[in-house]
């Protein structure tokens, strides 16, 4: 009913716009930019030199100058992306097709003079995928899942990379037309208002409606040779769109894994229904120079874009999708239903950030970890191992830094370097609050119930005041929760996790623990050398049983892995692949040991290291066991 109503209202607006003639001398108000949708278009049938032409038609301005911007920062990345860098041939045209004077203020902003005569803006957009040199967050290029792809078979349209906003029209509605070959499959959760075919039938133009610029940035699109599957999770329709350039992986096979996981998530969440549709966009990258290298995902309120290597085996891809998508799907709780004014009124040029990344990312990551044991997808020992991994990783960060201070200043050093800790210590903060609430309520309340209560109070259209959240949580829960937040989240005191584990009858011990082939219990066993641009093993390799048994020594330099040469530009892709190795796989690794080539050709065996292990106390009391049961299965 709401969709129909919006479509009807929008159609009425369009009729008004279409019946008015837009000229510089028009004195009526029905063509003013402030009352009309900004009409935008992308034409994928007219790509030239790997650039998509974009047209922006804003309506009539009454001011002499206007400023148009593409985002410097987009939500969810917590880093500078500068999407204006990828714009070429920027032109502002008057009603006669003549160019108006423009001034580029910075990488992302243009001021247009004589704006009362502005008819439209045109420019071309380069994509980001094929110029990436490294992956990850904080580099010269945007993190891959927030980036763009322009390829004859696939278009990743993170729309913040193509469409911008006027300073004076941030809350204006948008109309978007995307023209593409008729043979393309197209998916987006953005409200579609119509489809029109070209006269010769070779192209289709899909029209979309966005209530404001936020909805443009929050609704990515996939176009091209896609494999699409749909399934239902409660009242939520899940749309899975997969691009596998060599058809190695299918949406049907991935759907089976996603459906099982997301049904479990929905069971865990219960009555949280904050969106009728959720989209998963999976781009599987080839192993070549022009492929994206930043593997991971970027959440949107009702979708996620995932980038992973196409070469991953089925089992490894399934494991990665469970870990990545489970985290992103839980964002329908926060920030979709619970968020601050900084999120709700996000400034894409000079953003301010909430103090509460521990909640947005940390609690979300905690849910993505806890629900798997709650729903029987992993064993309790596997869950404990994941928690220990987060503790070990967080110990390598600045454990005495105020988490709220770090969150609020996440774009600048020394805080930016600590960003990864939101997924480690942030999740552990969520765990501690959960255990405290279970203890205080005799097992009846936990952090999920708190988030549901906050969601009911606020919801997606009502932001909370950032400075008041901790006080509010304290009043909604228990004094012990408020004291914890003030001491360990606002304050600089490191958390003693043993205090919390003891409440549920667990303890940390030293023993032989399983590890993978690039880490010892969460600690990387390589020491990358940027001066020599090589990746040697560190001293830690001596404590990794697989490599030690195969004669690898500290200082041995990785040269080739399964025939692929390792360099700084290929390192993330190759080492990510090594992280996914499983016992039984045949491998061939070539090392350089002081100029001598060392070849290791063998079958992987399980690797072990000496490390910390979280396990159940043999003398745990009935009270501790009951609290543990409520925590893990509540």
Language-model regions: role of each:
Residues 15-17:
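C-terminal motif of bacterial Sec signal peptides marking the signal peptidase cleavage site
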Residues 19-21:
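Bacterial signal peptide processing site
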Residues 26-73, 158:
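Early extracytoplasmic/domain-onset interaction patches
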Residues 58-94:
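N-terminal, post-signal-peptide region of Sec/Tat-exported proteins
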Residues 82-89, 93-275, 293-296:
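Non-catalytic architectural context of zinc metalloproteases
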Residues 227-356:
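Juxtacatalytic substrate-recognition/specificity segment
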